[in-house]
Amino acid sequence: MSVDVTKMPKLGFGLMRLPEKNGELDLEQLCKMVDAYMASGMNYFDTAYMYCGGKSESIIKKALVERYPRDSFTLTTKLPQWMMDEGIDGRDRIFNEQLTRTGAGYFDYYLLHSVEDGANYEGYVKYDCFNWAMKKKE
């Protein structure tokens, strides 16, 4: 699969920190933000399993996935190796949980989160996550 980078938006909507109201994520405000972003011609959203205390993927389902056609936006999320408590089985558990949380059906991009020297990289190697991710791509 090749990606035509000329068609990619120049600005992504990061979901690591989101507006809150009374200690909860503010869905109404997020919907306004998503609408303004989409209306400006942008469509790339980036989230991760642990963002906003694990609630980012679920709220983007309500603010984006349930409100816009799936082919109108690009969604990226990430596999956190350090949260794969059960090892190899954790890859699929987390991936499937992310599909459920987002309701997206598929991810346009799926990243191995925080691949760096040390424990994270070693964990990705130990649990064969690089090959696993390539198979998911197919």
Positions of PLM-derived features:
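N-terminal binding-site loop/beta-alpha segment at the start of enzyme catalytic domains
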Residues: M1-F73, W132
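Active-site mouth loops of central-metabolism enzymes
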Residues: M16-E28, K78-G90, G118-E122
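Basic side chains
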Residues: R17, R67-R70, K78, R101, ...
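Flexible cofactor-recognition loop at the NAD(P)H-binding site
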Residues: L18, M50, Q81, A104, ...
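Glycine/proline-rich, positively charged
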Residues: D35, D85-E138
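Short C-terminal domain-edge/linker segments immediately following a structured domain
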Residues: G41-D46, L75-T77, G105-Y110
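A short, structured active-site edge motif that brings together acidic residues
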Residues: D71-M83, Y110-H113
